[in-house]
Amino acid sequence: MASKRLETLCKSLTREVGRISSQTGRDDYDARRKVADIARELINETTHPSDVAAQYTINMAEMACLRMFQKWKLLDKIPASGSISYEDLSASINADKNLIARMGQMLVATGKLRQTSPSHVAHTRLSTAFAHRSPPAVWFSMSFDETLVPWTQWPRYFAKYGPRQPSGQTAVPMTFAEGADGELTCYEVIARGGPERMADFADGMQGIPELMPAAGIYDFAWVGEAVAEGEVDSDMPLIVDVGGNLGQALLEIIAHTESSIPPDRCVLQDRADVIAAADALDNPVLKKVRKMPVDYHQGQPLKGALIYYVRRCLHGFTDEVSIKLLKHLTAALPADPRARVLICEQITTTPPDPYTTMMDICMMNVGSKERSEDDFTNLVTAAGMKVIKFHRGEGVATHVIECARA
C-alpha cells in the first residue's frame, strides 16, 4: 500500500514540476507551492517516526544560527558571487572565529550556505533571501524574535494559567516571555525594546508580498473610474488606510490601478510614531498621501471617505476590540451606497491551510486569532454592517471582506 502511494506521489510530482517552467507571476507561485506540497507528502511517507524529533532539533539549530547571521549582518557580507572566509566574517564584527565557523557549518549542513573550502562559505539560492532586509529576511527575524521566543515559554505559561486560550492584553504568552506578565501590553513590550525592534516589527508585520498581497484581490479600478467620470465629490477622501503602517499597501494599490487613484486623495492613518516614520520616507507617491496620526480604538476622526481599508489589524485584536474598531468605521461611512469598509485578512478553512494555521498560532501569543468566514460575518454584523462579498486571492489564504452599512 505504501509503495503504491509513493508511486502516485512521484507521478504527481513529475507532472507538477513540468508545469513550473511555463508559469509566471502568481501562477508560478501556485505551481511551486503544489510541487512543495507533494514533496512534503513524499518526505512524510518515507520518514521513520523515530527520525522526526531529530529533524525538528536540526531545524531549531538551523534557525538559531540563521538568526544570528542575520543579526550580525554576516549574510550581507557574503559576496553575491564568490566566497568569504570565516576569518574575514568574524573580523568584520570583531567576533570569535570559531563561534562564527560553528554557526556557519550548521547552515552549510542544512544547505542554506555552500562550503567552497573548509574555511570559506558562499551564498546559495536560498540564503540570499535572508540578506539586506528583504521582505522574507525581515519576516523571519520578526517571527523568530516575537513568536518563537514566546512559544518556548508555553509550558511555563500554561502551567500558570491553565489549558485555556490566552486573552486580554497583558496576561498573554508574549508579555509572559518578556517578564512583563500582567504589566505591559505586547506593543509596550516591543516599544521597550527600542527603535530597532520597533522597526523590525513594523516591517515584518507587512509580511511577504507573495503570501499577503494588498492589491489584486479586490478590484479598486472602479474608484479611479469614478474619479475620472466626476462621480465623486472632489473633496471626498477615496481610500483611508486604517493602521496602514508605512503606506506599503496604499502604494501597492495605487500602482496596481496604474495611478488612476490620486495619491493626494488617499489617507494613511496609524500611531503618531509610525506616521512620523512614514513622513521621513523618500517616496514621491507617498509624499502626496495625506498622513494622519490616530488612535483608531478611540474613534475615526475622518468621516465620509469612500473606502476605509483595514489590513492585517483585526487578527491582532480580540472580538470585543475588533467590533469596537469596526463600529467606529461604520459610523464614519457616508450615505453614498458605494461606500465600503474593506477588511484584508487571512481566513481559516477546513481542512486547515498550513500558512493561515501558523498565523493563528502566532496570534495566540498576543491573545488573538485568525478567523473563519462565519467569524468575520459575526464581527461585521455586530458592528452594524453587512458582508457584501468575500474576495479571495488565487493561491493564497488572504481575503478582502467587502462590507457596507447594514
Swiss-Prot record:
The active site is at 315 (proton acceptor). Its EC number is 2.1.1.-. It comes from the Eukaryota. Gene3D superfamilies: Vaccinia Virus protein VP39 (3.40.50.150), Winged helix-like DNA-binding domain superfamily/Winged helix DNA-binding domain (1.10.10.10). S-adenosyl-L-methionine binds at residues 270, 312. Belongs to the class I-like SAM-binding methyltransferase superfamily. Cation-independent O-methyltransferase family. PANTHER family: O-METHYLTRANSFERASE ELCB, PUTATIVE (AFU_ORTHOLOGUE AFUA_4G14580)-RELATED. This is Methyltransferase cfoD. It comes from Aspergillus candidus. The lineage of its organism: Eukaryota, Fungi, Dikarya, Ascomycota, Pezizomycotina.
